[in-house]
Amino acid sequence: EALRGEGAVLRNLAGERFMQDADERAELAPRDVVARAIHSQIVAEGDPHVWLDISHLPRNKVLRSFPAIAAHCLQQGVDITSEAIPVAPTQHYFCGGVKTGLRGETSVPGLFACGEVACTGLHGANRLASNSLLEGLVFGHRAARAAVAHARRAPIEVTLGSAAGPGCPRIVSTDPHELRMLRTVQDGMHTTMWQHAGIVRSSRGLASAMEELNALSLNLSGAFTGGEHSLEALEVENLLTVAQLVLACAARRKESRGLHFTRDYVHATDSEKRDTVLSSSDVDLQLTRAMPELVSR
């Protein structure tokens, strides 16, 4: 993104620029537009990447402006001052997350969230470039101060390093069969979410993904038959829950807005200009139209 801002251009396998056809701002278009344009080229050409070319700029300028990028690419055998860089979209940022108030407080007393895990509403439907400091620094500072103030009012009555809670001891799985099963479930979830809940979505794809995740959840249930659960199993279970919430939320939005783009509704509509908050109770997903009442004090 920094390279594009400095004048780098995107080219397909034939060496042709394609961003002018996708948006009048060409390479300076918002990241969701650029990602979809690259995705379209990759699908059409059957190649895993396109090319980012900054070789037309003076060598000294490139090395002075992007020393870290130049060094990293050179380690991979690419001299960005004379060669194009193979690039492809990837999961980079999550605009949704745990709903918080202005100080990182959540609907769970004593639980605070900040950074990419939190949904502050700061970025709307599409984060601008180089804008993460607001989440990490500003809301991190606010959440830390609020957490300290809360702890002083209500001291924690648990010894650090003890059990995470009743019936949930901190243990690491040593069962090879369970570890293989967890890896299979996690890999399947990653593949499904990338294919159906990634850059370009559709109603059919989201429904198919939900069916696949439900099947993976059944496979995972074997890890919870005993009285103790490993951290690995709990983590995969939480990942599946979040993935199901993402799918359910995306399926209910009948429009395209920001990072959420669906082939079935390619334009944004005023009727869908709202927040969507989902809560999970076991495996049942419930849609809440209104935001939970969170008051900062």
Question: Locations of the language-model features?
Answer:
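An anion/pyrophosphate-binding glycine-rich loop and adjacent beta-alpha core
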Residues: 1-85, 146-152
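Glycine- and aromatic-enriched mobile tails/lids
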Residues: 17-20, 25-27, 37-41, 93, ...
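FAD/FMN-dependent oxidoreductases across multiple families
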Residues: 67-112
